[in-house]
Every structure is written in C-alpha cells, then in structure tokens.
Amino acid sequence: MVRVRAVVMARDDSSGGWLPVGGGGLSQVSVCRVRGARPEGGARQGHYVIHGERLRDQKTTLECTLKPGLVYNKVNPIFHHWSLGDCKFGLTFQSPAEADEFQKSLLAALAALGRGSLTPSSSSSSSSPSQDTAETPCPLTSHVDSDSSSSHSRQETPPSAAAAPIITMESASGFGPTTPPQRRRSSAQSYPPLLPFTGIPEPSEPLAGAGGLGWGGRGYEDYRRSGPPAPLALSTCVVRFAKTGALRGAALGPPAALPAPLTEAAPPAPPARPPPGPGPSSAPAKASPEAEEAARCVHCRALFRRRADGRGGRCAEAPDPGRLLVRRLSCLWCAESLLYHCLSDAEGDFSDPCACEPGHPRPAARWAALAALSLAVPCLCCYAPLRACHWVAARCGCAGCGGRHEEAAR
C-alpha cells in the first residue's frame, strides 16, 4: 500500500522518551497486506502488517500486525507513534509528506479491518500454531515497554467503537488531544441561539480522516506557505446611521422607542468644497511614515518601512562595498590571520582587530602582536582614518557606503 523511509523508534520508560531500534539508521517501512490460506468453501482471509527493514544490513526492525483498537498519535509533522495493547512503536520520517502518506495508508487499512472485509488473525479461532506465531502483533518486546509514564492521557476505546482507530494530535506544550469537530458542533447545537444571526456560516464538510475521526486547527503546511504580512497602512472607519423613518417599511415591524438623544435631528451636513479654480494646483501632500508599507529584508529577514525606491534603513547583513574596500586597502586580513592562529580560543573565535571592549584574556599580548605586525605591514595604520571616512560617508548617505535593507522578491 505504501513504502517510506524512516527511523524506527521504541519507547523507553526508564528515560521517558523514544530511542532508535538497533542503534538507529534508516529503514524501509511499508504497510502491506498478507493473504492467508483459503478455507474450504470460504473466501481468502488475510491481515495487514507494518514491516520495517533497515537499509544498510537488511535487518528487520519492525513487524506489527494491525488490529482494531489501535491508538495513533501525531506528535509533530515528522514523528508519529502508535500503540496496540502493550506494544508501542514510533517512526521518524524524512519529510511531512511521507508522514502524511503513511498515515493515510495506515488509516485505510484500519478502515478495511473495521468494515469486516478482512478477518484479523486475533478473531479467528481455527488458525494453526504456525499462523499464530507468524501473526504475533509485538515481536520486538525487548525494545518496547509499557507507557506508564506518558505525559499525554488517553481514553479507553469503548467496546462499541473498537473497530475505529483513535487518532490524537499532541504538542510540545503538553496539551491533550484535540476535540473532533463533530462533537463540538453537537454540543453547540444543543443550546438555542440567542439572536437570529446568520452572518457566520458553518463549514460545509467536517475535517475528518479515514475511520470517521478527524481534528481541526491550522496545519503544519499552512504556516510554511503563509503569505507576506499585511501592509501596515492606516485606514479610516466611517459609520453612517440611517434615519428612523427609513425603517418604517421593514419586515421586522415598527421600530422600538429610541432614547431622546437619538431622536433629535441630525446635524446639518458640512458645505461642499468649491471646485478648484483656474490657478495653479497645490502640490500633493507628502506621505507620512506611518502610511509606508512594511516589507521584509532579503538579507536579515527583518521587517522595515519600505520607501519609494524599495530600500530602507541600515542593515548589518547587507553588502557594503565601501567597507570592503577599506579592509582591502588596509590589509586587515593580515591582522585577522594573526589573531586566528595565535590568539584564538579553543573554538577558533577571536575578537575584532580594532575592538577595544574589555574582557579579553590577554590584552597586552594582543596589542603587542598587532603593533609588531604593523611594523611589517605599514598599511595597517591606514585602517583608522579610512574607517572614519567611511563612517562619515555612510552618515551622509553616499552611494556605496553602508548596507541598506532591500525588499525580498515576492
């Protein structure tokens, strides 16, 4: 039915988490249908299994027979786990698309079992001992323990609905499974509406998956594919009130008595502005900074006020041709190489050659090394005046000096 690549996980109650089975590694996990022997005068029987085989050594890492009553949990878009009795398995997928494909195939198999089209091995009383051994739902008992310390509480499946799978969505903050939309609507319909308001229609179809159970809320793909933020433009809200006499012929009947302040005559409308004369037209008003639209910078991904030329204020991540020219003319790369090879920490980090902030472990050795290097490379002494000229040019708005925010392409 489906074949994906994922890492098979097992529950570890000692640490309260999930551990990879057999030291980890990608496995090829598939949901397949296994056909059994054909009884005399009957149809061919079979069952569905989840089979996992590690790619590097072809070792079986997962073998689980599907039965009604399975509890399926979707923790996040790429990690799903399920439990069947005392057996608990989990899969870490490579992408949300593969996780959704596996979930749909698993729910389709459980729906087929619930309809009774296939008879599971647990309900047949005439199966041989060899078939019982081959259809054991939890052969990996050494890697799976009972989930007694689970932080997410679940409800037992009633006997009348044992054929339908239980699907829950968990979050990192510890909230329980979401309520299906069918139950929310049934509870809302039990109370009569207070006002005959029909401005907000209900959705035509509930969000439900295979098996008749689903969940609401915003999905993972909705956040990844969300559009750009709305422009921060100011708008004026104008509310107009109709006269009381206009409601006389309405179908709702005569209007109710209004208070005295509301029944007074409306104030006269302001006089209309005269048309512009033949004289010179006035200059257009300058747009205020609040009316400028907000855009996202392509370099630092921050929001900024977009101007007419599509650029904004200063951006530390934007390319600065003037500063790059100053570094090349003053040979600043020589000082950075000296600090990296001689005065860097265990992780290879070093401070800026011209930084004067306190806290350096060896300030005397640092400045002595830079002074000795300036004797061999005299152009290092030109960095301070060139840097000052670049700062003044950036303040004055000269072209090529100072990086600016640029709008990302839509």
Curated annotation (Swiss-Prot):
Residues in WH1 domain copies: 1-113
InterPro entries xref list: KBD, PH-like_dom_sf, SPRE_EVH1, Sprouty, WH1/EVH1_dom
GO BP field: negative regulation of epithelial to mesenchymal transition; negative regulation of ERK1 and ERK2 cascade; negative regulation of lens fiber cell differentiation; negative regulation of transforming growth factor beta receptor signaling pathway
A UniProt-annotated Pfam family: Sprouty
Keyword Ubl conjugation: yes
UniProt KW Glycosyltransferase keyword: no
Segments of this protein annotated with the region Disordered: 117-210, 258-288
Record-listed Asymmetric dimethylarginine modification sites: R240
Source taxon at top rank: Eukaryota
A GO MF label: protein kinase binding
Residue ranges constituting the KBD domain according to the UniProt record: 195-244
GO CC field: plasma membrane
Comp. bias intervals (Low complexity): 120-130, 147-165
Pro residues bias (residue ranges): 267-281
Modified residues (Omega-N-methylarginine): R248
Main location: membrane
Assembly with partners or alone: Interacts with palmitoyltransferase ZDHHC17/HIP14; the interaction leads to palmitoylation of SPRED3.
Annotated protein name in UniProt: Sprouty-related, EVH1 domain-containing protein 3
Organism: Homo sapiens
